[in-house]
């Protein structure tokens, strides 16, 4: 009786070790950063804001002086107008290993529908989408899939004066 229990526990332990070994390989280095980025873009398209927020690092900081909470609210402000559909397409141009992180650079295309402001937002965003975005990702824990977004860079996007992330009255300013 004890021997069969020991064999079952040993088999379970081997399965768990194999699972984590495989996941470590699948989510390591550049592959892991690209995989995390792909999930993030898919969550944006699906308007799953809480999933996006969980992928943003507590230490998030960017050129617009946004922190984790600010960028989460700004994404919601943007997406609030696309309640019928939102499609975010990403084409990776390069992936670069940096000290302790990975930079995923690429082009983004946005389509969608919803409120009357949605068409206006897409029209206003098009000139900015010509330039590439850079997303900086780093591993944040012991789990192989624990990648977090640390920074978003873009050469020409500016935050309009008076824009406050999460303030619905100012969400159309951007």
Regions found by a protein language model. Name each.
Residues 97-174:
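Exposed beta-sheet edge and beta->alpha loop/turn motif
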């Amino acid at each position: 009786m004890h021997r069969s229990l020991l064999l079952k526990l040993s088999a379970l332990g081997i399965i768990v070790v194999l699972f984590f070994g495989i996941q470590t390989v699948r989510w390591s280095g550049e592959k892991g950063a690209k995989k995390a980025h792909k999930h993030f873009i898919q969550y944006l398209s699906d308007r799953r804001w809480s999933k996006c927020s969980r992928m943003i690092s507590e230490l998030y900081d960017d050129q617009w002086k946004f922190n984790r909470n600010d960028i989460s609210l700004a994404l919601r402000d943007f997406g609030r107008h696309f309640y019928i559909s939102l499609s975010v397409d990403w084409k990776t141009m390069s992936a670069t290993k940096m000290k302790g992180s990975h930079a995923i650079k690429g082009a983004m295309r946005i389509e969608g529908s919803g409120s009357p402001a949605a068409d206006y937002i897409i029209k206003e965003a098009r000139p900015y989408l010509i330039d590439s975005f850079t997303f900086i990702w780093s591993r944040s824990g012991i789990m192989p899939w624990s990648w977090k977004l640390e920074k978003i860079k873009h050469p020409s996007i500016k935050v309009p004066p008076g824009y406050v992330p999460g303030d619905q009255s100012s969400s159309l300013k951007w």
